[in-house]
Amino acid sequence: MNLRALAAKAIFDVLEKGVSLSVALPEQQKHLASGKDKALLAELCYGVMRTLPQIEKRTAECLAKPLKGKQRIIHQLLIVGCYQLYFTRIPSHAAISETAEACRQLKFEGMVKVVNGVLRNIQRQLTPLSNESETLSYNTPGWLIKRLKTAYPGNWQEIIQQSHERPPMWLRNNRLSQSRDEYLAALDKLEIDASAGLSDDAILLAAPKDVATLPLFLEGAASVQDGAAQWAATLLAPQANELILDACAAPGGKSCHLLELEPSIKLIAVDFDAKRLERVQQNLDRLSLKAEVIHGDAANIDSWWQGEQFDRILLDAPCSATGVIRRHPDIKWLRKNHDIEELAELQRQILDHCWKWLKPGGTLLYATCSILPQENRDQISAFLARTADAKLDTLVQQASSQDIGWQITPGQHNMDGFYYARLLKATH
């Protein structure tokens, strides 16, 4: 099937059915043989998600009436066409003819003239895209802009801008295979430009690469993991032979990093999502690491764990993922304002429950890939107020010792947006 038709189908699944792009895109990429075509399909889908309000408005201006019902797929096809005309180097005639052909392949023969007409109209007048509202100016939903303005009055615009940048590719060196310097030297030998990141195992690539081209990647010499996420294992600081729980473990990057740091630990990796849990096992297998992988609910540990309390717990809590919009731009359209309070309540339940399963004297690291205070600073502040045996351990990375935890904003040191708070349980 024509590449533009596949793009329209993936975007339809995201915007009309609420499927995440990380699921919808690979589903359509299966139909393409060449890596080049798969990359173009990804560029079209991600590009549309980044610029959706502006290109939807521009497309609507050239339509006599909105497309509804079964014709929504053609609406998605038109915005794919509009994106090509404004944001890619694809020659206009090719973009238009290929998009019209996609309309045929989607079995809407009667709409081909409409698609042709709308796209030719746009091409004739490539006027600047509308910025008459903040949603249009920033290609971001109004509710999220409002929350960011409140949380970051001095730099909310920069945070939004960083969230639209194309994300860099980070690697985590597997210290059980080689030192970071040795892996950097191996990359250099292959003329792959890379530099050391802030945390001990982090490597930042100057340009994204296919993992199959990286030295000994498939044999477990390194993993793909953003620089911000790599702090989790370092901050939890596993010690020899400890019993450690990774409470929301999928897809398993942090579990694997914990085992790389301290192979003698007994690690229990748990997740509520059975499908994503398969990825945890795949990652462990590639890196030749061992953990007990359990399908279970971190808010109901009693139902799947009859062992003793844990020495350390990593709680990478379910969250809005507002810190990783640059990697997952569909989050802007899948998340809704009311989700934030619902997520904060879920986080509260999981945090309180995990705390009961932490040994006296133990450490719990609370983490999210959110940049919203309701899920981070406010969440931990409320937890400390209601939990007598909990104490916040100041992290050296914090901007100030008065801060509650460490908030990383998108693009800071080239990292994703992330939050960490390290909590210590009293010994008495």
Swiss-Prot record:
Its EC number is 2.1.1.176. The active site is at C369. It catalyses: cytidine(967) in 16S rRNA + S-adenosyl-L-methionine = 5-methylcytidine(967) in 16S rRNA + S-adenosyl-L-homocysteine + H(+). One of its GO terms (cellular component) is cytosol. Keywords: Cytoplasm, Methyltransferase, Ribosome biogenesis, RNA-binding, rRNA processing, S-adenosyl-L-methionine, Transferase. Its main location: cytoplasm. Pfam families: Methyltr_RsmB-F, NusB, RsmF-B_ferredox. The keyword GTP-binding does not apply. GO terms for biological process: regulation of DNA-templated transcription; rRNA base methylation. It is found in: Cytoplasm. Gene3D superfamilies: Helix hairpin bin (1.10.287.730), NusB-like (1.10.940.10), Sun protein, domain 3 (3.30.70.1170), Vaccinia Virus protein VP39 (3.40.50.150). One of its GO terms (molecular function) is RNA binding. S-adenosyl-L-methionine binds at C248, A249, A250, P251, G252, G253, K254, D271, D297, D316. The keyword RNA-binding applies. Specifically methylates the cytosine at position 967 (m5C967) of 16S rRNA. Belongs to the class I-like SAM-binding methyltransferase superfamily. RsmB/NOP family. This is Ribosomal RNA small subunit methyltransferase B. It comes from Shewanella oneidensis (strain ATCC 700550 / JCM 31522 / CIP 106686 / LMG 19005 / NCIMB 14063 / MR-1).
